[in-house]
């Protein structure tokens, strides 16, 4: 559709019909996720396919997980890979952090025994295709998890780690660059 504006210019708008958005239950999401060769996240009733990772992404996630595992040796915390699904009980969001840490007993979702609900730490390796989503929607979702103390965002293109830490109801961020250490105070 093309309009003539009062200024004499023109505006063109392309009209697109939109199909009604389908909303799924968590159980329906689980069925899709289990039966698919691609992992999915669950957000506001929508099932979102996740982008596949690169070898560098996988190696960085493994290095972060191994480092956490060494540092937590002897503590009542366990480090998990991206195979562990995490669910935010207050919003229903479910996803696969690149690395998760659960301290004390693993608590699982009432609808799925393979979904954790009580991580103390989640780590996301940022990538060009997911960085905006990870820093925005996903970070906000993770921050709703009552047990969560830290969200760690690891840059893919530079030596930079952001550690988001909870203090009461507030969250603050500390940034570690080349030669600096990222600290997860809540884990001791």
Question: Where do the PLM segments sit?
Answer:
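Gly/Pro/Ser/Thr-rich low-complexity, intrinsically disordered segments predominantly at protein N-termini
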Residues: 1-188
